[in-house]
Amino acid sequence: MHLTDLIEKTLTAMGYELVEVERAPAGLLRVYIDQAETGIVIEDCEKVSHQLTRVFEVENVNYERLEVSSPGLDRPLRTLVDFARFAGLEAKVTLRLPVNGQKNFTGIVQAPAGEPGQERIGLEFEGKDGPALLEFTLSELDRARLVPVLDFKGNRNKGNKQ
């Protein structure tokens, strides 16, 4: 079983979502997790770390060190579910190919719409001539991340708490 599939299967059984897996130099394995209803706290990371350590031992996964973390305020958006969940929030989007000479856009995410398999994601942004709408598919997307909203009055960004 592929490492990402193994991790995803384990996390799903525990009630968590796999956001990203990174292999870093010196055998470091980073796993980013989320939970739609409650977000992630340190105890979640501990629980997942202990479970993955056991699973990796049984499955003979080669790694030196494991880090489990929340995806952070600038969470990556990779799936239609991500874009639907974070509709209404600001994101930075980079397309694989330029649209009107531009690949990078920052704007408000709109929920995916369209026929299954042909869903298009909307991004409302400020164009040269005023408000504009970019529509793209996941296959046209290079990467996307939420834009962190820092509120120093103690309010948290809704990004991880929806």
UniProtKB/Swiss-Prot annotation:
Gene3D superfamilies: Ribosome maturation factor RimP, C-terminal domain, RimP-like superfamily, N-terminal
CDD domains documented for this protein: YlxS_C
Keyword set includes Lipoprotein: no
Gene Ontology cellular component list: cytosol
One Pfam family here: RimP_N
Subcellular location: Cytoplasm
Keywords: Cytoplasm, Ribosome biogenesis
InterPro entries: Ribosome_maturation_RimP, RimP_C, RimP_C_sf, RimP_N, RimP_N_sf
GO biological process: ribosomal small subunit assembly; translation
Functional note: Required for maturation of 30S ribosomal subunits.
Family: Belongs to the RimP family.
Protein name, UniProt field: Ribosome maturation factor RimP
Organism classification: Bacteria, Pseudomonadati, Pseudomonadota, Betaproteobacteria, Burkholderiales
